[in-house]
A protein has these predicted regions:
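Structural recognition of an alpha-helix C-terminal capping motif at a helix-to-coil junction
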Residues: 23, 37-44, 57-69
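Arg/Lys-rich amphipathic alpha helix in sigma70-family domain 2
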Residues: 48, 54, 64-84, 146
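DNA-recognition helix of helix-turn-helix
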Residues: 68, 72, 133-158
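C-terminal flanking helix
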Residues: 22, 43, 109, 113, ...
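Internal acidic/polar
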Residues: 73, 80-105, 125
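A short pre-motif secondary-structure segment
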Residues: 115-119
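Sigma70-family region 2
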Residues: 2-4, 30, 41-58, 77-79, ...
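A short, charge-rich alpha-helical start-of-domain segment used by transcription regulators
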Residues: 1-23, 36
């Protein structure tokens, strides 16, 4: 059971956030092994630092911010693994109807992929994303707009 402070234990943390963090990292990194590493490092940082949060939303935002930073670090490093194929995505439980969108999303530049995933997949507002990424809300709105345009081109030009 979690402590009275509302802080999650390791098992509860994985149950509560593990799947969402993995999806997020998988879209960012396009590689299951790297995504697993990023999630593990994110959760380990949480356990090591024992941060206190005012709300579950603040805790979730902190975890996604740390995960985004881990993903960026991984993307900066030399590629260790090839990108996921559509067959590998299907093997990881993605529905066939989602594969085209996931593939298109994974082909976008990182800054658009990150904004679109945080907003549309994880449900963060533009203000929350701006705070997480150290950008202005208007910059995030522009990234979302441009990202949607690029995603549309990626989906419809690929047919």
């Amino acid at each position: 059971m979690a402590a009275d402070s509302g802080r999650c234990g390791a098992g509860q943390l994985v149950d509560k956030y593990g799947s969402a963090l993995f999806r997020f990292c998988l879209v960012m990194l396009r590689n299951a092994a790297d995504a697993e590493d990023a999630v593990q490092e994110t959760l380990l940082r949480y356990i090591e630092r024992s941060p206190e949060f005012e709300s579950a939303g603040a805790e979730r935002a902190w975890l996604f911010t740390v995960a985004a930073n881990r993903c960026r670090d991984t993307l900066r490093a030399a590629s260790r693994h090839p990108q996921l194929t559509l067959d590998e995505l299907a093997g990881l439980g993605a529905e066939k109807s989602e594969l085209g969108i996931l593939d298109a999303l994974m082909n976008l530049p990182e800054k658009y992929r990150l904004a679109l995933t945080l907003h549309y997949v994880e449900g963060y507002s533009t203000g929350e994303i701006a705070s997480m990424l150290g950008r202005t809300p208007s910059a995030i709105k522009m990234r979302l707009k441009k990202g949607r345009e690029l995603l549309g081109k990626e989906i419809f030009d690929g047919e």
